[in-house]
UniProtKB/Swiss-Prot annotation:
<dbReference type="InterPro" id="IPR008949">
    <property type="entry name" value="Isoprenoid_synthase_dom_sf"/>
</dbReference>
<dbReference type="InterPro" id="IPR050148">
    <property type="entry name" value="Terpene_synthase-like"/>
</dbReference>
<feature type="binding site">
    <location>
        <position position="379"/>
    </location>
    <ligand>
        <name>Mg(2+) 1</name>
    </ligand>
</feature>
<feature type="transit peptide" description="Chloroplast">
    <location>
        <begin position="1"/>
        <end position="48"/>
    </location>
</feature>
<comment type="function">
    <text>Terpene synthase (TPS) involved in the biosynthesis of monoterpene natural products included in conifer oleoresin secretions and volatile emissions; these compounds contribute to biotic and abiotic stress defense against herbivores and pathogens. Catalyzes the conversion of (2E)-geranyl diphosphate (GPP) to (-)-beta-phellandrene.</text>
</comment>
<keyword id="KW-0460">Magnesium</keyword>
<feature type="binding site">
    <location>
        <position position="527"/>
    </location>
    <ligand>
        <name>Mg(2+) 3</name>
    </ligand>
</feature>
<keyword id="KW-0456">Lyase</keyword>
<comment type="pathway">
    <text>Terpene metabolism; oleoresin biosynthesis.</text>
</comment>
<dbReference type="Pfam" id="PF01397">
    <property type="entry name" value="Terpene_synth"/>
</dbReference>
<dbReference type="GO" id="GO:0016099">
    <property type="term" value="P:monoterpenoid biosynthetic process"/>
</dbReference>
<dbReference type="InterPro" id="IPR005630">
    <property type="entry name" value="Terpene_synthase_metal-bd"/>
</dbReference>
<dbReference type="InterPro" id="IPR034741">
    <property type="entry name" value="Terpene_cyclase-like_1_C"/>
</dbReference>
<keyword id="KW-0934">Plastid</keyword>
<feature type="binding site">
    <location>
        <position position="375"/>
    </location>
    <ligand>
        <name>Mg(2+) 2</name>
    </ligand>
</feature>
<dbReference type="GO" id="GO:0010333">
    <property type="term" value="F:terpene synthase activity"/>
</dbReference>
<dbReference type="InterPro" id="IPR001906">
    <property type="entry name" value="Terpene_synth_N"/>
</dbReference>
Length: 624
């Protein structure tokens, strides 16, 4: 069942209730796809920016995309020259890791720096710090022991700063709620009600002290990890957002003001761990006045900087491999499409920051780049007859039977064929079983959804919301962007786990839904200008005569908010039989692709925020 009914509802209020109630009943896309189609304004890649129809070299009249040129070429490797691959830096990093482990171990009742009045917040602080700095992978055992200790003192009113604190503390409770929930502990958001007055407002002082502002920062961060139906989390988000925005207008520029700005900018569902680490490095510990605490922050900061820069030496090797693949595959002959392989690799590097996940990073970049070319081929360049031939050949999966295809399609067929087979071999090595047929079916479903949309474009058909949305979740590309790359990781995905993170799981369905819905809100105007009418917005308006564009946008945004809460629950449900660590990779793919729509369609206009992301997380080292 799609989010919006195709039957016009009596009022906006009724429609909103219908949308909310259907969030947890989203029907996974069936492999049997109807014979209609449409444009992909909601995918994370956008179709043509031009309505021009020049005659190509083969004498066929074709549209062109009008995209800006590729921002990166082979010269990008020169910018990745870094000395941090030398053994001396790694050895220094290992020593710092041991010192930080000692910091974890020193937080005990016997340590003079801590007391029963502050030990809980100190424990939460160090866990939160290593996670935001992107170095937590070294301290999994220490983090688990620390959070077990904090959780053992958790109450229905939250926690105080220490185990002997008389009253609960907002900062400790908010940070504890967020951190414990992200690690799968069963903690209720109801604890926040104890910090509200009779009017539902969170208590705060007129003076707006630094300590209070940090408490509200953590309240805001906690509110983003809301589950469905948690009204107090919605109230916390509204209050903390208003409070922090107003505080930014009053306080002087400082590391605190920069941190507040970064936190407001980095919402949970577009937050990229490597970008968060890069931003947090710039503000971490700058205002620390306590000498002993300063020494701790300096060690954490040095390790974070080393880890960030050392990773760049690995990125250089991987990017060199990706550029060779791009050139050897003949992508430079494909002139009708965008080329975003560097941008996609950057996104992969921002979510899979552990060095051992090289195959994931490269596989994700390759899959997404192929998706982009196919998108432009189906939306812009290919004729309907050519596209039907290509779709049929994908189902045959036989490279010897492609003589019927035009030259450019033969090239794309072989690129897709070789890539899927290569990643299947890598997945077999990682998983110990053959997954080729599974991957082929995913790609067939995806290509079918593209073909369906191409037919909608060709016939001028505007589908109902249900028709559009069910097909659109598949054509969002989320599944094929995630499936094979995660299977190449050295993480076991047995069948019972895989079915809970891939099709037809609710996790996959919600992640695809968010990408479709958010993409449509960013791209529908450009699509309409190109003559591609169908989108969540236009289909909603068709199903609900009298609804304005603003009504549709408001409604879709409300639905996105609720779908996000549903995705939070699917990821973090403490009663789930699937480990968070298995689900998080699919969730992170959703975050990465969602990031491209954070400000605009960053996949068609990639020379602003997307370019900045490449510069900040791939090309620029952190200064010491």
């Amino acid at each position: 069942m799609a989010i919006v009914s195709s039957v016009p509802l009596a009022s906006k209020s009724c429609l909103h209730k219908s949308l909310i109630s259907s969030i947890h009943k989203l029907k996974p896309f069936c492999r049997t796809i109807p014979t209609l189609g449409m444009s992909r304004p909601g995918k994370y890649v956008m179709p043509s920016m031009s309505m021009s129809s020049p005659v190509s070299d083969d004498g066929v009249q074709r549209r062109t995309g009008g995209y800006h040129s590729n921002l990166w070429n082979d010269d990008i490797i020169q910018f990745l020259s870094t000395p941090y691959g030398e053994p001396a830096y790694r050895e220094r990093g290992e020593r710092l890791i041991d010192e930080v482990k000692n910091m974890f171990n020193s937080i005990s009742m016997e340590d003079v720096e801590f007391s029963p009045l502050n030990d809980l917040i100190q424990r939460l602080w160090i866990v939160d710090s290593v996670e935001r700095l992107g170095i937590d992978r070294h301290f999994k055992n220490e983090i688990k022991s620390t959070l077990d200790y904090v959780y053992s003192y958790w109450t229905q009113k939250g926690i105080g700063c220490g185990i002997e604190s008389v009253d609960p503390d907002l900062n400790s409770t908010a940070l504890g709620l967020r951190t414990l929930r992200l690690h799968g502990y069963p903690v209720s958001a109801e604890v926040l009600k104890h910090f509200q007055n009779q009017n539902g407002q969170f208590a705060c002082s007129p003076s707006e002290t630094e300590g209070e502002m940090r408490s509200i920062v953590n309240l805001y961060r906690a509110s983003l990890i809301a589950f469905p139906g948690e009204k107090v989390m919605e109230e916390a988000e509204i209050f903390s957002t208003k409070y922090l925005k107003e505080a930014l207008q009053k306080i002087p520029v400082s590391s605190l003001s920069r941190e507040i700005g970064d936190v407001l900018e980095q919402d949970w569902h577009t937050n990229l761990p490597r970008l968060e680490a890069r931003n947090y490095i710039d503000v971490f510990g700058q205002d620390t006045k306590d000498t002993k605490l300063y020494m701790k922050t300096e060690k954490l900061l040095e390790l974070a900087k080393l880890e960030f820069n050392i990773f760049q030496s690995l990125q250089k090797t991987e990017l060199d491999s990706l550029l060779r693949w791009w050139k050897d595959s003949g992508f430079h002959h494909i002139t009708f499409s965008r080329h975003l392989h560097v941008e996609y690799y950057t996104l992969a590097s921002c979510i899979a920051i552990e060095p051992q996940h090289s195959r994931f990073r490269l596989g994700f970049a390759k899959a997404c780049h192929v998706i982009t070319i196919l998108d432009d081929m189906y939306d812009v360049f290919g004729t309907i007859d050519e596209l039907e031939l290509f779709t049929a050949q994908i189902k045959r999966w036989d490279p010897s039977a492609t003589d019927c295809l035009p030259k450019y399609m033969k090239r794309m067929y072989m690129i897709l064929y070789d890539m899927v087979n290569e990643m299947s071999r890598e997945a077999e090595t990682a998983q110990g079983r053959d997954t080729l047929n599974y991957a082929r079916q995913a790609w067939e479903d995806f290509i079918d959804s593209y073909m369906q949309e191409a037919k909608w474009i060709a016939t001028g058909y505007l589908p109902t919301f249900d028709e559009y949305f069910e097909n659109g979740k598949v054509s969002s590309g989320h599944r094929v962007a995630a499936l094979q790359p995660i299977l190449t990781m050295d993480i076991p995905f047995p069948h019972d786990i895989l079915k809970e993170v891939d099709f037809p799981s609710k996790l996959n369905d919600l992640a695809s839904a968010i990408l479709r819905l958010r993409g449509d809100t960013r791209c529908y105007k450009a699509d309409r200008a190109r003559g591609e009418e169908a989108s969540c917005i236009s289909c909603y308006m068709k199903d609900n005569p009298g609804a304005t564009e603003e009504d549709a946008l408001s409604h879709i945004n409300a639905v996105i908010s609720d779908v996000i809460k549903g995705l939070n629950w699917e990821l973090l449900n403490p009663n789930s039989s699937v480990p968070i660590s298995s689900k998080k990779h699919v969730f992170d793919v959703s975050r990465a692709l969602h990031y491209g729509y954070k400000y605009r369609d960053g996949y068609s206009v990639s020379n602003i925020e997307t370019k900045s992301l490449v510069m900040r997380t791939l090309l620029e080292s952190v200064p010491f």
